[in-house]
Amino acid sequence: MELAAWCRWGFLLALLPPGIAGTQVCTGTDMKLRLPASPETHLDMLRHLYQGCQVVQGNLELTYVPANASLSFLQDIQEVQGYMLIAHNQVKRVPLQRLRIVRGTQLFEDKYALAVLDNRDPQDNVAASTPGRTPEGLRELQLRSLTEILKGGVLIRGNPQLCYQDMVLWKDVFRKNNQLAPVDIDTNRSRACPPCAPACKDNHCWGESPEDCQILTGTICTSGCARCKGRLPTDCCHEQCAAGCTGPKHSDCLACLHFNHSGICELHCPALVTYNTDTFESMHNPEGRYTFGASCVTTCPYNYLSTEVGSCTLVCPPNNQEVTAEDGTQRCEKCSKPCARVCYGLGMEHLRGARAITSDNVQEFDGCKKIFGSLAFLPESFDGDPSSGIAPLRPEQLQVFETLEEITGYLYISAWPDSLRDLSVFQNLRIIRGRILHDGAYSLTLQGLGIHSLGLRSLRELGSGLALIHRNAHLCFVHTVPWDQLFRNPHQALLHSGNRPEEDLCVSSGLVCNSLCAHGHCWGPGPTQCVNCSHFLRGQECVEECRVWKGLPREYVSDKRCLPCHPECQPQNSSETCFGSEADQCAACAHYKDSSSCVARCPSGVKPDLSYMPIWKYPDEEGICQPCPINCTHSCVDLDERGCPAEQRASPVTFIIATVVGVLLFLILVVVVGILIKRRRQKIRKYTMRRLLQETELVEPLTPSGAMPNQAQMRILKETELRKVKVLGSGAFGTVYKGIWIPDGENVKIPVAIKVLRENTSPKANKEILDEAYVMAGVGSPYVSRLLGICLTSTVQLVTQLMPYGCLLDHVREHRGRLGSQDLLNWCVQIAKGMSYLEDVRLVHRDLAARNVLVKSPNHVKITDFGLARLLDIDETEYHADGGKVPIKWMALESILRRRFTHQSDVWSYGVTVWELMTFGAKPYDGIPAREIPDLLEKGERLPQPPICTIDVYMIMVKCWMIDSECRPRFRELVSEFSRMARDPQRFVVIQNEDLGPSSPMDSTFYRSLLEDDDMGDLVDAEEYLVPQQGFFSPDPTPGTGSTAHRRHRSSSTRSGGGELTLGLEPSEEGPPRSPLAPSEGAGSDVFDGDLAMGVTKGLQSLSPHDLSPLQRYSEDPTLPLPPETDGYVAPLACSPQPEYVNQSEVQPQPPLTPEGPLPPVRPAGATLERPKTLSPGKNGVVKDVFAFGGAVENPEYLVPREGTASPPHPSPAFSPAFDNLYYWDQNSSEQGPPPSNFEGTPTAENPEYLGLDVPV
């Protein structure tokens, strides 16, 4: 027989309890076209399996049935779970008139749910030539109720007598979603078939009679439903119905598509556990059901395992173990720790492909009590396999199965050693569960063996399947076993044939049951093979009586079993010796009695469990143990005549010796401790001296981050060096003054902006303004505002460079009629360069907008306002804000929704800033509340294209506003793009009536207000003072006026390659002007002035044509190629009233050259900014927003004063809305003062552009 026949799994193996829906369920078979193992009992096997069966949980295989066989036991079958095979039969008809559905969970040849093959007469040719003889073979299918095949096709071949197979409309039988439905029908027949009965309107039938007309339930449906009961639109069946219905409800189905729950078709069985939404608990569902095949059952059938997910299975899932309850039900339970090792048999785990038990795998079963799988012994087991090097299995190796008690699969034996006359190696086997069946039908198969008896004396259960015992010529005792007591359902039976006749040969040979076996039931000869004893059982042997009154050892009787008494029990002659097997259940003690137990001797110095105190007892005259008067605990050597410890009297010599020894040990211990202390002190002193001399140890272990050191310089100013001129603005945390910085010991005046905190400001505000100073001090770019210094008075004062033209937003609004395309694109280039520099030093700005860009000159802008800026550490790529008010309309979508700020979120803000410039200061999303911005952005809406922008410029804005931050351009790419556009500005920005002639100097209201102030003349620009240029100061024409004459000169420098250009705005009185191409020795300043410093002068002289020669380095035709050092910047066409401005090609400054005079220390080029060490991580590892301080004092540079406002030393807070900085609202309201009473702008709390991240948007 093939291996597949021995190792096939039986599909489902048990009978449902009769009370479950009244449906009888039976197992199927899995033999395919193989010959039956016992042709003599084959028909009986089919009858036992399918008698009264309605649902076949497996395959219905009808093969090799003779012509005269009665198959009436098939008439109740209504449903087949697997496939149906009718092959090699000689019967004319198969009575399956009630079969409605074939589910096809298993398929014949992996394709067919119905196969009808070679059902013919073996002598078909002889019958055809013999007059009057009708050939045998299948003539009609008569599957008149079959209306559904869920999966699989139809194969009909080799049936010469079969009719009507081509008259069936198979399309109607197949489910519409049956993707695997091949139809292979052979219509070659040797007889003429009559037509369908006239009652068959559609001429589709299964047989000749009117009852065999095919019932159509699919192709006749008019409304597109899967099944229906008629042709009307109202005749549709429920979607959970299969095979048709009698009405529209899911309780009117003839069969269920998925699961049958008490006669109602459902998609799923009710869950065992439900969720209570009121108590938020998982609760047991009293209506829960287990899934068993296509049915919902309250409990799993016997021999099946219930799982936690509500299914009935044959094998537990991984990390689960089988558990048997007291009532016999079995379930799978999850292991609390790694599951215990189990023994696997054939068909399981590593033995899944093994054919039989061999000498190569038999040792794996040593010591096993339960085998998960099956056992099969074939001729090759004992013959060996020389080709694969497997030796024959020796009889003594079979002793490993003597400990076996349970098999979950089947036991198949077709070969056995001749030296063994029985199967006594399985003498302790109690259960064969049969979850896996041989051929899908047999749990126990014994065939062709030379044994004389079975010897399975402990076998008490065959959980499922049939027992087949045949062709064992010497086997007796087959009929002496009560097989009915071993079976668990009525479909089980014993099939036997070809064994030794019991009535003559077995009896005559004395092979009968022992007289002590009850009812003549036994597994073999002798009193040890009885199924049950007629009298008593001692161990494994039946006896007539127990040794209660006589014999040794004495016994007591419990449930007709003879059990021995305890050895310390005294045998009694006229009464029972004991009442149990314990020492306290004796009638009398053989030696002594301690408490209630009989003992061989009384305890003498015995320590009880978990006790360190010994117990001493002695026996009295009656043999009862009594406690000794002295309970010795140690050195118990002297005992009295009773065995108790004698009283110990201490000797003086012993006391003296013990005292002397104790004193000596104490002295030795003192000496040792003293020596150890001295040596320890010497070692400490030695190690201290070595450390002081060498000092090679580090206090902390090195964890280099790879970051560059931040060598920025912080200038500390004295309050006496600062002179406040007028108030520029006030806010909740302080006041911004226009002032003059006069360094000690120098006759120099420098215009500055001074930010002073209020007197009652909290320490947090002082810390935050120092953090802002840290950020500003670390930047060194011509396009980023620079910090000049701080004054550490009682309230910290921040000193920054004064920008005379105010913020870029006000500038473009005021001069919108005079701005050209070149101005706008140059500003875009400079802002992009400034942001690219901030990205290089890992600084996230978070508040880039036109209002936060200051105008130093009409050709030079700088990024400012670092109140919200954040430095990223060396291992950080993004910043997460904790709260605070932020400019919603300038922010990227991920920053609004997830508080995530990166350099790419600054790119979004840059796009909005460019939009502001191109619309001359229009408000983004004007009229739309800030809270609606996230939804608007998620829906894909963006700012519209400005009228002056070409599609090239607008597409760059759109790229900046991509949802995916990685899809946005980098700042270095934006620099390249806008530099390219700046070379040909009118091609990309179209301004109507743009003046192509020389532009006039653009002044501003703010600029004029600064010039009108007193003491603002004869000032020196801050950057010129901090980084003097060689040749900048002209020689003093007269000694008396030399101290101030040079201050009227202004210059501009740009770094190109390694040199620096300077351009004097006024010719020297003593000689020709310095060549503008001459290198400056002051190059390399950390803060590099790359603009044309307009200065706050009282007048500017026009340049001579000779002085304009540096301007010719730029081509008047922007389409011509430019030198690389121009970096895409195009100078104005006519610059006589203005100084030249040249962009620098790289953001990071070059190393400084050695100046002629002393200079303040500067930070090396390329220094990396670091996060302040005082920052501590907050919740979830996110650094708290220590820069959340936001108010007017955050941005003093671009605050525009109101015209005509007086400047008292401490004026009342009457200021422009710009001074209050409407775009900010501080998080901590307790630290703010009351808002100004005469504030004329929009209150900060109502500003729509800024919204707190701590408020859900």
Swiss-Prot record:
One cellular component term from this protein's GO annotations in UniProt: plasma membrane
Subcellular location: Cell membrane; Cell projection, Ruffle membrane; Early endosome; Cytoplasm, Perinuclear region
Listed PROSITE patterns: PROTEIN_KINASE_ATP, PROTEIN_KINASE_DOM, PROTEIN_KINASE_TYR
Extracellular side: 23-654
Signal peptide start-end: 1-22
SMART domains registered for this protein in UniProt: FU (SM00261), TyrKc (SM00219)
Positions annotated with a glycan in the UniProt record: 68, 188, 260, 532, 573, 631
CDD domains for the chain: FU, PTKc_HER2, TM_ErbB2
Entry's transmembrane regions: 655-677
Binding site for ATP: 728-736, 755
One Gene Ontology term of the molecular function aspect: transmembrane receptor protein tyrosine kinase activity
Active site: 847 (proton acceptor)
Enzyme class: transferase
Cysteine pairings via disulfide bonds: 26-53, 163-193, 196-205, 200-213, 221-228, 225-236, 237-245, 241-253, 256-265, 269-296, 300-312, 316-332, 335-339, 343-368, 476-506, 513-522, 517-530, 533-542, 546-562, 565-578, 569-586, 589-598, 602-625, 628-636, 632-644
Keywords of this entry: Activator, ATP-binding, Cell membrane, Cell projection, Cytoplasm, Disulfide bond, DNA-binding, Endosome, Glycoprotein, Kinase, Membrane, Nucleotide-binding, Nucleus, Phosphoprotein, Proto-oncogene, Receptor, Signal, Transcription, Transcription regulation, Transferase, Transmembrane, Transmembrane helix, Tyrosine-protein kinase
InterPro entries xref list: Furin-like_Cys-rich_dom, Furin_repeat, GF_recep_IV, Growth_fac_rcpt_cys_sf, Kinase-like_dom_sf, Prot_kinase_dom, Protein_kinase_ATP_BS, Rcpt_L-dom
Region spans: Required for interaction with KPNB1 and EEA1: 678-691
EC number(s) reported in the record: 2.7.10.1
GO annotation (BP), single: positive regulation of phosphatidylinositol 3-kinase/protein kinase B signal transduction
All residue ranges annotated as the Protein kinase domain in the record: 722-989
Stretches assigned to the Cytoplasmic side: 678-1257
Subunit note: Homodimer. Heterodimer with EGFR, ERBB3 and ERBB4. Part of a complex with EGFR and either PIK3C2A or PIK3C2B. May interact with PIK3C2B when phosphorylated on Tyr-1198. Interacts with PRKCABP and PLXNB1. Interacts (when phosphorylated on Tyr-1250) with MEMO1. Interacts with MUC1. Interacts (when phosphorylated on Tyr-1141) with GRB7 (via SH2 domain). Interacts (when phosphorylated on Tyr-1250) with ERBIN Interacts with SRC, KPNB1, RANBP2, EEA1, CRM1, CLTC, PTK6, RPA194, MYOC and ACTB. Interacts with HSP90AA1 and HSP90AB1; the interaction suppresses ERBB2 kinase activity.
Family the UniProt entry places it in: Belongs to the protein kinase superfamily. Tyr protein kinase family. EGF receptor subfamily.
Protein name: Receptor tyrosine-protein kinase erbB-2
Species name: Rattus norvegicus
Gene: Erbb2
